[in-house]
Amino acid sequence: MSETSSAPVRRPFHRRRKTCPFSGANAPRIDYKDVRLLQRYISERGKIVPSRITAVSQKKQRELAQAIKRARFLGLLPYVVA
């Protein structure tokens, strides 16, 4: 008695790789004074969102983190959100 499944074999799900929002022709520049842009990359608790969620490249993630920290130091962004 051989066991055969009636369900077809499923192909593994392949998620399309996200592209960096800061690379490209008309991509926004990372600037510590651009608070509206920086707030998109901060969680509701005030933490910097990791690049695996935002799909920012490694180089641009470092620039983004530096800009967020600089804006926090100057008082443009809060360190923590209550």
Swiss-Prot record:
One of its GO terms (molecular function) is structural constituent of ribosome. Residues 1-20 are annotated as: Disordered. GO terms for cellular component: cytosolic small ribosomal subunit. InterPro entries: Ribosomal_bS18, Ribosomal_bS18_CS, Ribosomal_bS18_sf. SUPFAM superfamilies: Ribosomal protein S18. Keywords: Ribonucleoprotein, Ribosomal protein, RNA-binding, rRNA-binding. One of its GO terms (biological process) is translation. It holds the Pfam family Ribosomal_S18. Binds as a heterodimer with protein bS6 to the central domain of the 16S rRNA, where it helps stabilize the platform of the 30S subunit. Belongs to the bacterial ribosomal protein bS18 family. Part of the 30S ribosomal subunit. Forms a tight heterodimer with protein bS6. This is Small ribosomal subunit protein bS18. The lineage of its organism: Bacteria, Pseudomonadati, Pseudomonadota, Alphaproteobacteria, Hyphomicrobiales.
